[in-house]
């Protein structure tokens, strides 16, 4: 099965359409309160055609609620989200011609086959049913088109959800946890597909708690925790300075003084430091420095490490 799946990934079509009509997505001050609980406390970001933005953070951070507000499924307490200046509900014609979305891989009728599922959704999307076989081929499910969805793995349901989002041939994709349940080959396929979708002019917003798995998928990062945006960045800028590490010292001043005495470049970052050297070099330099209780002192430079420096979340909450 694994060999067959790898062959499907290797022969994946390079693009569903040669050109996309992506839109500028603007999220401005989105807030959602349930009584005294602030599920989302003011999220702002913009992303345009040719870009993939990752809304990243632990489970329960407010990512799904933010996406639902963008799509008009949850009414915000305040704020708005627009696609080229138009809210989702006011998009002309079939909204799925403009924006394709996946919000859950658990909403399939289990006795329907994959083809029957897309057949049922085609009229909703205003889509030609001739696209169904094309999309099943695209997401690697052509050989499983007649299998009941109830027999699908989580990864297969994720791919069927993506095919559903693509029915209307949209220029924008809004994907909630699309990497969840995918094996390494599926992650590789998704990364290639989203990159090609964006390169063809599409716009992508995806959410994930799997920071390491999606790090190579995104151009722009919005880290969210407990309903609040804690950091935004472009990935190109993040890795433009070469190798780096994250340090979580109990005494940041002590760590900074030690690094400075050895000529190691560093900068403050959240409750820790971003150090421009490999972890082994940094660990050797900081042998006498104690870590924040319950945390390692030196971490490999990646998004998950930065998140830990910005918050008091433990690593197990991100995986």
Predicted regions located by residue number:
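Residues that scaffold the ATP/ADP-binding catalytic core of kinase and kinase-like folds
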Residues: 91, 238, 306
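Intrinsically disordered, low-complexity regions enriched in polar/acidic and amide residues
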Residues: 1, 6-9, 13, 130, ...
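ABC transporter nucleotide-binding domains
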Residues: 22-25, 32-212, 216-225, 231
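Short, charged/small-residue-rich alpha-helical element at the C-terminal edge
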Residues: 243-319
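ABC transporter nucleotide-binding domain
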Residues: 190-277
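Structural motif detector for alpha-helix initiation sites
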Residues: 114, 235, 300-303
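ABC-family P-loop ATPase nucleotide-binding domain
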Residues: 1-31, 313-319
């Amino acid at each position: 099965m694994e060999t067959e799946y790898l062959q499907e990934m290797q022969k994946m079509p390079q693009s569903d359409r040669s050109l996309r009509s992506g839109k500028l997505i603007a999220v401005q001050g989105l807030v959602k309160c349930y009584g005294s609980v602030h599920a989302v406390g003011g999220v702002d970001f913009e992303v345009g055609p040719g870009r993939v933005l990752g809304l990243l953070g632990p489970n329960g951070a407010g990512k799904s609620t933010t996406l639902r507000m963008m799509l008009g499924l949850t009414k915000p307490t305040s704020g708005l989200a627009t696609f080229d200046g138009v809210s989702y509900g006011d998009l002309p014609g079939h909204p799925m011609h403009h924006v394709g979305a996946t919000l859950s891989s658990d909403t399939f009728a289990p006795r329907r086959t994959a083809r029957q599922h897309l057949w049922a959704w085609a009229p909703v999307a205003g889509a030609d049913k001739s696209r169904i076989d094309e999309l099943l081929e695209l997401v690697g499910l052509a050989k499983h088109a007649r299998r009941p969805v109830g027999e699908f793995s989580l990864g297969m349901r994720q791919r069927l959800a993506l095919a559903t989002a693509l029915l209307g041939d949209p220029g924008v994709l809004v994907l909630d946890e699309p990497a969840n349940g995918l094996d390494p080959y599926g992650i590789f396929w998704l990364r290639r597909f989203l990159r090609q979708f964006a390169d063809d002019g599409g716009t992508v917003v995806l959410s994930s708690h799997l920071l390491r798995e999606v790090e190579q998928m995104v151009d722009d990062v919005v880290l969210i925790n407990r309903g609040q945006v804690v950091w935004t960045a472009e990935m190109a800028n993040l890795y433009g300075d070469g190798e780096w590490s994250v340090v979580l010292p109990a005494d940041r001043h002590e760590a900074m003084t030690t690094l400075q005495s050895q000529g190691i470049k560093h900068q403050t970052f959240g409750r820790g430091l971003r150090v421009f050297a490999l972890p082994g070099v940094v660990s050797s330099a900081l042998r006498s420095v104690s870590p924040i209780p319950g945390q390692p002192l030196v971490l490999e430079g990646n998004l998950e490490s930065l998140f830990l420096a910005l918050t008091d979340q433990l690593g197990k909450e991100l995986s």
